[in-house]
Curated annotation (Swiss-Prot):
Family: Belongs to the COQ7 family.
Lineage: Bacteria, Pseudomonadati, Pseudomonadota, Gammaproteobacteria, Legionellales
Protein name: 3-demethoxyubiquinol 3-hydroxylase
CC cofactor note: Binds 2 iron ions per subunit.
Main subcellular location: membrane
Species this chain originates from: Legionella pneumophila subsp. pneumophila (strain Philadelphia 1 / ATCC 33152 / DSM 7513)
Pathway connected to this protein: Cofactor biosynthesis; ubiquinone biosynthesis
Gene: coq7
Keyword Manganese in annotation: no
C-alpha cells in the first residue's frame, strides 16, 4: 500500500485551504446546525449589526482553527496525531458552516481578513508540528482553551432573545472543550507562559479587526 508523501499532503492542504476560504453557497456538514429548528427572533438593526460583528469574529476564529489543524497535520510525525488533527478539523468545518449561515441570516458576511489569518495559522501549525507532536498538541489545547473563554464572553454579550446564535455558540464551546481535553489526553505539553501571552495578543488583534472588517 502506497504511503502519502509530503507532496501528497501539501496538495491536500491546498485543497483544504480553498475549501475553507472560498465560500460555497452551502457547506457540506456532518451535523445539523444547533439553530436549525429554532424560530427567528425580531432584532433591531443595531442588535443585528452587533451580533454580526461577533459572529464574524467567531467565523474568523474557526478559519484560524481549521488552518492550525491543517498546518499541524502537514508536519505531524505520528499517524494517530495526523488522524486526530483531521478529525478535529472536520468538526471545525461544521462550525464554519454554522457561523456562515447565521451571518447570512443576519444580512452580513465573513471577514475580508480571513486569508491573512488563515496563512498565519497554517504557518504556526506547521511550525508547532515541526517542534514535535507533544508541542503541537499543546498548541491545540491552549488554542481551544482560549477559544472556549472567548465564546463564553460572546455568550455574555449576546441579547438573551437571540436563541439561534446562543445555541450555535454553546455547541461550538462544547466541541472546543472536547478538543482541548482530547489533546491533553493524547500527551500535550503545557506551553510556556510567554507563548500563551503571545497567542492571546494575536487573538485580540484578530477579534478586534474581524468585528469590523
Amino acid at each position: 500500500m502506497r504511503t502519502s508523501s509530503f507532496l501528497d499532503r501539501l496538495i491536500g492542504e491546498v485543497d483544504s485551504a480553498l475549501r475553507t476560504l472560498v465560500l460555497p453557497q452551502k457547506r457540506i456538514t456532518t451535523r445539523q446546525s444547533p439553530a436549525e429548528n429554532l424560530a427567528d427572533t425580531v432584532l433591531s438593526a443595531q442588535e443585528k449589526k452587533h451580533i454580526s460583528g461577533l459572529m464574524r469574529v467567531n467565523h474568523a476564529g474557526e478559519v484560524c482553527a481549521q488552518a492550525l489543524y491543517q498546518g499541524q497535520a502537514l508536519t505531524a510525525r505520528l499517524t494517530h496525531i495526523k488522524e486526530q488533527m483531521a478529525s478535529a478539523a472536520a468538526e471545525e468545518v461544521d462550525h464554519l458552516a454554522w457561523c456562515e449561515e447565521r451571518l447570512y441570516e443576519l444580512g452580513s458576511k465573513p471577514s475580508l481578513l480571513n486569508p491573512i489569518w488563515y496563512c498565519g495559522s497554517v504557518l504556526l501549525g506547521a511550525l508547532a508540528g515541526l517542534a514535535g507532536d507533544k508541542v503541537s498538541l499543546g498548541f491545540v489545547a491552549e488554542t481551544e482553551r482560549q477559544v472556549t473563554a472567548h465564546l463564553q464572553r460572546h455568550l455574555h454579550y449576546l441579547p438573551e432573545k437571540d436563541k439561534k446564535t446562543i445555541a450555535i455558540l454553546k455547541r461550538m464551546q462544547e466541541d472546543e472543550e472536547h478538543h482541548a481535553h482530547t489533546a491533553m489526553e493524547a500527551g500535550a505539553v503545557e506551553l510556556p507562559y510567554i507563548i500563551k501571552q503571545l497567542m492571546n495578543a494575536v487573538s485580540k488583534l484578530m477579534t478586534q479587526s474581524s468585528y469590523y472588517i
